[in-house]
């Protein structure tokens, strides 16, 4: 409780500068690695679903400032068939405005396959499933917390970076080596 009070107090003492936060977000969106991973796309039925990725949402929250996000496994149980499930809460909290957004969900410890599926019993498999599914809910919470226009501008900036050809140039081994040696010279 004391740690949370301290975080809220610090956030109110040092409020975010929205202009500076937006500039930091745009600087990060100029990075080819983020730009390439900024938007997810997957087929759902006859349509294609797209949106800001989990990685972009994390960048938005980190640079927006005065907020925290994550997930908690509230409990693990077994159903009447012996299949385990977790109750999980994903959240994003703007400490400055005290806006707390959460999503609570139940997650069956089950891996679906083309031939049906099987229950998960290995702790690592269960943890990875929880983390993966919680990340999607965290993204939704962050995108609800950060103003929509900031998100739209970030997505547009990432698309511009990705389409500028900069990503391809950075992938070129020779370009990477030049960048590394130039960076080394700066710090020598």
Placement of each model-derived feature along the sequence:
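Polyanion-binding surfaces on beta-sheet-dominated domains and ring/shell assemblies
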Residues: 1-87, 91-188
